[in-house]
UniProtKB/Swiss-Prot annotation:
Belongs to the PRA-CH family. Binds 1 Mg(2+) ion per subunit. Pathway: Amino-acid biosynthesis; L-histidine biosynthesis; L-histidine from 5-phospho-alpha-D-ribose 1-diphosphate: step 3/9. It comes from Methanopyrus kandleri (strain AV19 / DSM 6324 / JCM 9639 / NBRC 100938). It is found in: Cytoplasm. GO terms for cellular component: cytoplasm. Homodimer. The keyword Metal-binding applies. It catalyses: 1-(5-phospho-beta-D-ribosyl)-5'-AMP + H2O = 1-(5-phospho-beta-D-ribosyl)-5-[(5-phospho-beta-D-ribosylamino)methylideneamino]imidazole-4-carboxamide. Pfam families: PRA-CH. One of its GO terms (biological process) is L-histidine biosynthetic process. This is Phosphoribosyl-AMP cyclohydrolase.
Amino acid sequence: MSHVPLDPETARKVTSSLNYRFEIGGEPLVIAIAQDAENGDVLMTAFANEEAVYRTLTTGYAHYWSTSRREVWKKGEESGHVQRVVEVRVDCDKDAVLYVVEQEGGACHTGYRSCFYRRVTRDGSFEVVMDRVFNPDEVYR
């Protein structure tokens, strides 16, 4: 059963209680992790400021803070590969959030379902362990 979206007042109560201890470019942030609701796979990790968490809680779609563009962005707003949030969890220090999501398409901008598509091998190289689910050259024009 989905626990989001929340009403605005409840969402503000949640966002104001988090510990935005990480700072990039002067922006207070929490770590945001997306996990596949169906199989538990970790899909991606990013950052979220207070507004990104608020939008996630009130819309039911994952929002993050872009450290390069310095703005809140909805996952999939360009690609269509949105993350519908079914649950939000908070870690023990309240400085990280876990978005349990139903992923549409791929989570990674490189075309993979997960950003964790490579594993470290015995010789220290990286081995691709997943197939691409979309062609990024066709999606991001």
